[in-house]
């Protein structure tokens, strides 16, 4: 996947998460993910992250402002995301992750990850922050 700073460097433009909204060949090839991806259609920048053993993201905040135009949902799509294989920390608290689980990520809070095993894969979706999508998120989490 292409980081936002790298995309901005390559294009010479100030891009937003919503500028990445065209389905790619990977989307077409991964038909098993269509029910989840299409639930939020249209999406902003969306990527699959495959963390190898030792892979990590340092503590950071992606967007500290309440006025951001997207929110983030992450789906853990491999088996190597259990507590002994993968660490997800948010605001100083380690969260237990379930394979197949889908989680809202509050990117205003400090978060970090660390993978202890190969093939810790997750789907990161930046979803337009519309009233309809916020209601979808709340409705989905009521059944959690």
Regions found by a protein language model. Name each.
Residues 1-39:
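Non-heme Fe(II)/2-oxoglutarate
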Residues 71-77, 102-104, 117-135:
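A short hydrophobic beta-strand segment most commonly corresponding to one strand
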């Amino acid at each position: 996947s292409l980081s936002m700073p790298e995309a901005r460097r390559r294009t010479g433009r100030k891009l937003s998460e919503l500028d990445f909204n065209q389905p790619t060949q990977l989307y077409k090839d991964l038909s098993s993910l269509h029910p989840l991806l299409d639930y939020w259609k249209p999406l902003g920048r969306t990527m699959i992250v495959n963390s190898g053993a030792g892979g990590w993201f340092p503590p950071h905040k992606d967007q500290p402002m309440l006025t951001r135009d997207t929110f983030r949902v992450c789906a853990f799509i491999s088996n190597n995301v259990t507590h002994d294989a993968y660490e997800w920390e948010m605001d100083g608290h380690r969260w237990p992750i379930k394979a197949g689980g889908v989680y809202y990520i509050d990117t205003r809070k400090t978060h970090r990850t660390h993978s202890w095993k190969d093939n810790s894969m997750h789907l990161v979706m930046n979803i337009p922050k519309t009233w309809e999508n916020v209601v979808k998120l709340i409705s989905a989490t009521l059944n959690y």
